[in-house]
């Protein structure tokens, strides 16, 4: 986990976490260059994807104010750095109680509450925590999922990956082919069984690295010596490539899994699953951790609404309706990206004896590899998958209008119900996302001087009568934003997704129907 997607940074922004995490990550000037190499012993890499730095992406966001861009650029930050940052924030919050080392032994769901039995690591004693709801974010082997009797579709795939985290300042040798974020190393498939045998990730652009050694089923390669594994992966087709290693931080073996929980909630809808507890995917595309954060951003506001008393029963049911199809979508594209990487050997006959040769055969092979890599570059560029998926659920107010067709590579701005609202900068330079509240927000575009409109008044009166907290963001003279959003009135959820849109509401009853459905009180 070393990529925090732009959508995740949008989520962290209203939580007050985006800037702090960015300060801990790789400096924003460094690009996301992905290289393809037959081994660092060769003079040059075979091809590269020149993905922009966070600064370059932010410049594009500022200049391309047409709704197609995210509000925040992506971020390079390793998982351990991110976890340490979030731990600090939890320790600072009076709303969070931390119990590190404690283990959950049993979760029991009833119609009115959840009983969670936990064990103290120091005394071995157990206690019961009673709550209205519980969320199992306890990983792929989730005890919460098992206690709820929820099965998984799918499971481990027939390969493994050896991960070695290490420190080295031998930059002359590591950067022989140029700086990189990732470098994938090609191997002769007649020897390795696959076209990509490993990779190296630059975790901090200073001295921390991770080598991935992809193991085919039945691999006889030894994993006893981490240094030898690193040399072999870096050398790829050219044989071992020694570097000076300052420290081996950790070595582990990981078995990739593609699995999806049959349900995201217990039978009584008081226990929920999020993250790897309900979906596991291969890391291609960087969807895994980012998907889990989006899960809890969706679920969090809904549980808050239930606890605060303004949410209806459909809210908790909508979590699975919305998030499980997104997991299926991202699992699919993760497999597509991995298939393109591993499919190189089917498109190009890789041969270690000629790949670095200066003759016509070597030149032809290198050119074919370059063409294949450039023609299959969606790996970290599927912004439609990230931003353009639709939430289908009973709390989304259906619309007779059509929505843009799904394009995995690009996001088409739309306020069609169920889609993420488009980011746009307003006339004063502020972001429209920063106008959203912690509950529902009615965005109201006003052409002339500000004043109450019938639409806004109907929604405001309905919200007051039914004790539904509603922010009304009246935007005056915002022609560009209104054109991009395509409607005069848009009801936006706390997670930035659209509940309803229209140019007007003709009556208070219509506003009531929209608001009560968006808050989960009526089913469509």
UniProtKB/Swiss-Prot annotation:
Keywords: FAD, Flavoprotein, Monooxygenase, Oxidoreductase. Its EC number is 1.-.-.-. Pfam families: FAD_binding_3. It comes from the Eukaryota. Pathway: Secondary metabolite biosynthesis. GO terms for molecular function: FAD binding; oxidoreductase activity, acting on paired donors, with incorporation or reduction of molecular oxygen, NAD(P)H as one donor, and incorporation of one atom of oxygen. FAD binds at residues 48, 145. Disruption phenotype: Does not affect the production of oxopyrrolidines A and B. InterPro entries: FAD-bd (IPR002938), FAD/NAD-bd_sf (IPR036188), RIFMO-like (IPR050641). It is an enzyme of class 1 (oxidoreductase). FAD-dependent monooxygenase; part of the gene cluster that mediates the biosynthesis of oxopyrrolidines, polyketide-amino acid hybrid compounds with feature structures of tetramic acid. Does not seem to play a role in oxopyrrolidines A and B biosynthesis. May be involved in further modifications of these oxopyrrolidines. Belongs to the paxM FAD-dependent monooxygenase family. This is FAD-dependent monooxygenase opdD.
